[in-house]
């Protein structure tokens, strides 16, 4: 568990690790629900896919692995909820554990960790601004957070690959 606590977010667009063109799956890990988003094949735009209910039997891992296959994902990006003080809390440990379990199921497809501080808060604000009532937000908030995580990754990836091309 010591190594798990010291894991840091991966770098989008790292030339040594980037799988190239293809769909990416974004995952927002919650204690009850897991939000899932997917990019287009050119990795430009993230859109919501579904919310997967967590289950002690591991059914949620089977569903996530099935989505990777169904959507043809070349990379999976799991949100890493670091604290504002940049520490690894219990939510981050949970996300790392889920990412590790999923990685074992879908190898060789890479599973990355992405800094996701405040994405759920940002998603709630966006939904509120769009006129979605609090009660209705519960059904889509996890997907909206997954979209925010993945879109941030895609934007950073695009900037990093552009810089690498200019170098």
Swiss-Prot record:
Bias (Basic and acidic residues): 7-21
Organism: Mycolicibacterium paratuberculosis (strain ATCC BAA-968 / K-10) (Mycobacterium paratuberculosis)
tRNA processing keyword on record: no
Region of interest: Disordered: 1-24
SMART domains in the record: YqgFc
EC main group: hydrolase
Superkingdom of the source species: Bacteria
Similarity section: Belongs to the YqgF nuclease family.
Single Gene Ontology MF annotation: nuclease activity
Name of the protein in question: Putative pre-16S rRNA nuclease
Signal sequence segment: none
Keyword terms: Cytoplasm, Hydrolase, Nuclease, Ribosome biogenesis
Single biological process term from Gene Ontology: rRNA 5'-end processing
Database matches in InterPro entries: RNaseH-like_sf (IPR012337), YqgF (IPR005227), YqgF/RNaseH-like_dom (IPR006641), YqgF/RNaseH-like_dom_sf (IPR037027)
NCBIfam families listed in its UniProt record: RNAse_H_YqgF (TIGR00250)
Function description: Could be a nuclease involved in processing of the 5'-end of pre-16S rRNA.
Gene3D superfamilies attached to this UniProt entry: YqgF/RNase H-like domain
Pfam families: RuvX (PF03652)
Localization per Swiss-Prot or TrEMBL: Cytoplasm
